[in-house]
Amino acid sequence: MVEPLLSGIVLGLIPVTLFGLLVAAYLQYRRGNQFGL
């Protein structure tokens, strides 16, 4: 009974992690542009 819950958590975490990395990269890119690098 643990596997469905674990797979659900993993499937829920993967998109959130990818979205977080995308936002972090976007903010870092904008911050770099503001400093004129």
Curated annotation (Swiss-Prot):
**InterPro entries per the UniProt record, alphabetical:** Cyt_6/f_cplx_su5, Cyt_6/f_cplx_su5_sf
Pfam families to which the protein is assigned, alphabetical:
PetG (PF02529)
Q: Where in the cell is it found?
A: Plastid, Chloroplast thylakoid membrane
Q: Which residues cross the membrane?
A: 5-25
Q: How does it sit in the membrane?
A: Single-pass membrane protein
Which terms under GO biological process does the entry name? cytochrome complex assembly; photosynthesis
Q: Does the keyword Transmembrane apply?
A: yes
Where would you say this protein principally sits, based on its record? plastid
Q: Out of the domains of life, which is the source?
A: Eukaryota
GO cellular component entries: chloroplast thylakoid membrane; cytochrome b6f complex
NCBIfam families this protein is in?
Answer: PRK00665.1 (NF001907)
Q: How does it assemble?
A: The 4 large subunits of the cytochrome b6-f complex are cytochrome b6, subunit IV (17 kDa polypeptide, PetD), cytochrome f and the Rieske protein, while the 4 small subunits are PetG, PetL, PetM and PetN. The complex functions as a dimer.
List the HAMAP family.
Cytb6_f_PetG
Briefly state the protein's biological role: Component of the cytochrome b6-f complex, which mediates electron transfer between photosystem II (PSII) and photosystem I (PSI), cyclic electron flow around PSI, and state transitions. PetG is required for either the stability or assembly of the cytochrome b6-f complex.
What this protein is called in its record is Cytochrome b6-f complex subunit 5
